Amino acid sequence: MKTTIIGCGYLGFALAEKLQKKHHFLTCTTVNPKSIEKLKKTTQKSLIMRGTDKNELSLILENNDTIIVTVEAKNSDEFENTYLQTAHTIKECAKEIETPKRIIFTSKTSVYGNLEGMWADESTPLKAKDDFAKILIDTENTIFSLNDLGWSVAILRLTQVYGGENHEIIDLFKKSYKEVMPGHKDYYTNMVHRDDVVGIISYIIDHDIKGIYNISDDEHPTREEFSKKICEKLNLKMPKYDPTLADFSDNNKRVANYRIKEKGYQFKHPRRII
């Protein structure tokens, strides 16, 4: 199978390693020149390219069966260009391609907005109010509209991904730890191990699954409960939480994962590894 991964970074590279072992012919793109040599060891073709480069993207889409979009914005200034404009470029190219493709897009559960602690499943209305989440919603809609061109579309709404490459929970906590942390202490946390995101994408390809799916593990401790476990392990002072310090849209929800389980996927890490 000919497969391309557009935006091969933290998640995309792990996915490339998985698919390479399953004998996919891989074309992977990155915007980071430092990643090229690493990608060359895993892929048949790798190139530096932005998702808005229509000429390059058109060739890639034409020559591959499965397109996986795992782009990630480096900063807020690049958010719209990285997500929405990439989606628009893909759709422009798709209109010129005769053979329908399969596309898998990794979105985020921030599209649900603040649900005040309620559960979010795939039927939950998208009520996000911050600009970044609105861009993701528009991006999802653009990708989903490829169904009209006969494409097979899967959208994965990821919670916070951890695992591997200095992204273990302990590593992430150490980087953000302060005696006073931003946010509400009683808000729920939602995470998923990178192994499961990679496993789910591979499973979706193998079983020709389409639609929208939340990707989260089974645990939803509050920030306070979660921090307590980590602080006990690291022998750190338990932080306090101050909502007024948050420079982000502080959303409270529990993300349900039953729909992907109903498709037969079994989580490798249903509980968090601390």
Segments from the language model and where they lie:
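NAD(P)-dependent short-chain dehydrogenase/reductase
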Residues: F144-Y188
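NAD(P)-cofactor binding segment of oxidoreductase domains
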Residues: N64-I104
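Mid/C-terminal beta-alpha module of Rossmann-like enzyme folds, strongest
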Residues: V198-I200, D206-N251
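N-terminal Rossmann-fold NAD(P) dinucleotide-binding loop
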Residues: G12-F13
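Alpha-helical substrate-binding/gating segment
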Residues: I170-V180, D186-Y213
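C-terminal amphipathic/interface module of NAD(P)-dependent oxidoreductases
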Residues: M49-K54, D247-I274
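Conserved Rossmann-fold NAD(P)-dependent oxidoreductase catalytic core, especially the SDR/UDP-sugar
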Residues: T89-D131
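Catalytic helix-loop patch of NAD(P)-dependent Rossmann-fold dehydrogenases
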Residues: E116-I155
